[in-house]
Amino acid sequence: MENNIKLRELKKQDLPALENVIRKTWDYDKFATPKTARKLAKVYLATCLTNQTYTRIAEVDGVPAGLILGKNIEKHHCPLKYRLRQISALCGLLISKEGRGILNFYKNVDEIYSQLLKQCDKDYRGEIALFALSPEYRGLGIGKMLFH
């Protein structure tokens, strides 16, 4: 059976499916309860959306299966709707001890990334803010389609 694959812009109704793609891609359920894993995926996607100027969604048979978010550093500004979504998602994660612990871990990882980037001695004009594809759709060339 051949899949119907389409690349398109992000729609608000895509967000829950894309949060699930992130949750599966990074195996959040292996180190968090299902409830916290869902909240963490929501925070991660919301944070990435604050850091992008380009979005493309891979839709397979009408279902969001993956995404790529890019950032042109010179043109970037954070849309208020994405910042508010990020704040709301963070508040949802901060209400539990488990959520606070996981956020602290990721804060440390982010600090390491920042230090490594400073040591690079090169200014980049852009970056890939997020690139994820649901595991069940890998190997079909969808990632290449998103990247190109």
Specify the residue positions occupied by each region the protein language model found.
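Short coil/loop residues immediately preceding or within conserved phosphate-binding loops
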Residues: 53, 123, 128
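Conserved beta-strand in the GNAT
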Residues: 57, 63-72, 127, 132
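A short gly/proline-enriched turn/hairpin at secondary-structure junctions
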Residues: 28-34
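Conserved acetyl-CoA-binding loop-helix of GNAT-fold acetyltransferases
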Residues: 130-133, 139-148
